[in-house]
A protein has these predicted regions:
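Glycine/Thr-rich beta-alpha phosphate-binding loop at enzyme active sites
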Residues: 113-130, 160, 167-229, 263
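Ferredoxin-like iron-sulfur electron-transfer modules
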Residues: 302-321, 334-337
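Catalytic cores of alpha/beta
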Residues: 25-31, 89-100, 154-167, 220-227, ...
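N-terminal capping/small domains of soluble enzymes
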Residues: 1-89
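Active-site beta->alpha loop and helix N-cap motifs at the rims of alpha/beta catalytic domains
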Residues: 57-128
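Iron-sulfur cluster-binding cysteine motifs and their immediate structural context
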Residues: 246, 324-337
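Glycine-rich phosphate-binding active-site loops on the catalytic face of alpha/beta enzymes
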Residues: 41-47, 108-114, 167-181, 236-238, ...
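C-terminal helical cap(s) of enzyme catalytic domains, especially alpha/beta-barrels
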Residues: 49-61, 181-201, 247, 259-284
């Protein structure tokens, strides 16, 4: 399962993504001991920001000394710093300071949707000109591999992605969480999380966003100007099959947060064993050999076969007589049944 990402040799493709699951030495070392290959630890800024409480909801930098310690204690693991600045000087300063700490690479956060100030996070990722300016600022402070984390809150990720690469980014990551409002109460008229009776537009994550992440990864992988640019897929991975999607669509790295929050670091066992089993039964020697294999199969809607007709099929062994197939086909399938 070993694979290279940004010229960094990784024992497997699976990293903790930039979030609370990788915010201190103890948490990250535990994950490393369990088999995770690397971490993009919680975004570091040069400005103070207060968290609200509660800040989560479900649906029905020089103070980070542990980065150098991690590299000393786990030399075979990959440690990446996520950074976010308010202006060009901030980005340059953060890049320079984190480079001194001995990390392996930098990830620039152009995609977080729930910022307390304008001009940060996803506001940057939506604007190719800002992406260009800030990537160049980071480059002035570091020669480490640079990963630009792109936002899903755009019609097309391609323009900002091209801007990032042209400005000096070595790799691209997608996606971050998606702007949303969830669970609006009919009693309080507030969505969740409810903070003193109010809510705000926040970031939606979890397995439901995975197909959206697949599309953004494909858009970048299929763009000629981004050919051979390493891709990191993040968004909705819960099991090895989800991870396989990203690999087949061109990713050489996979980042995970929400599934860890739900099930713990132990999900690495399923990710590794499932992917190994897939490679074994398909007689594939290395995970590198499947990267991008699905790209030729994705075509424009106008290129799909219009002659073939599929007819309803039934698995009588699994049928329990609930009648849902009849309802779906009769009420929503042109009365196929």
């Amino acid at each position: 399962l070993s694979i290279d990402f940004c010229d960094l040799h990784c024992e497997n493709p699976f990293f903790l993504s930039s979030s609370v699951v990788g915010s201190n030495y103890e948490m990250i070392s535990k994950a490393f001991d369990m088999g995770w290959a690397g971490v993009v630890y919680k975004t570091i800024t040069s400005f103070a920001h207060e968290e609200v409480s509660p800040r989560f909801a479900t649906t029905p930098g020089t103070h980070h000394g542990f980065d150098g310690r991690l590299k000393k204690d786990y030399p075979g693991k990959i440690v990446i710093a996520s950074i976010m600045g308010q202006n060009e000087d901030d980005w340059t300063f953060l890049a320079r300071e984190l480079t001194k700490a001995g990390i392996d690479a930098l990830e620039c956060n152009f995609s977080c949707p729930h910022m307390a100030y304008d001009g940060l996070g996803t506001d940057v990722g939506e604007d190719p000109a800002l992406v260009d300016r800030y990537v160049r600022a980071i480059r002035r402070g570091s020669n480490l591999p640079l990963i630009a984390k792109m936002t899903a809150n755009v019609t097309s990720v391609v323009p900002p992605a091209i801007a990032a690469v042209n400005a000096g980014a070595d790799a691209l990551a997608a996606i971050n969480t998606i702007k949303s409002i969830v669970n609006v109460s009919g009693d309080t008229f507030s969505g969740e999380p409810c903070v003193s009776g109010k809510t705000a537009v926040g970031g939606y994550s979890g397995n439901a966003v995975h197909p959206i992440a697949n599309r953004f990864v494909y858009d970048m992988a299929a763009t000629p100007q981004l050919k051979n640019i390493p891709l990191s897929g993040t968004g909705g991975v819960e099991n090895w099959q989800d991870a396989l999607d990203f690999l087949l669509l061109g990713c050489t790295n996979i980042q995970i947060t929400t599934a860890i929050m739900q099930y713990g670091y132990r999900i690495i066992d399923d990710l590794l064993s499932g992917l190994k089993h897939y490679l074994k039964i398909h007689h594939i020697s290395n995970v590198r050999d499947i990267v991008g294999k699905a790209l030729p199969q994705v075509v424009g809607a106008d290129a799909l076969d219009r002659e073939t007709i599929c007819y309803p099929k039934f698995n009588h062994k699994q049928c329990i007589g609930c009648g849902r197939c009849y309802i779906s086909c009769y009420d929503g399938g042109h009365q196929a049944l």
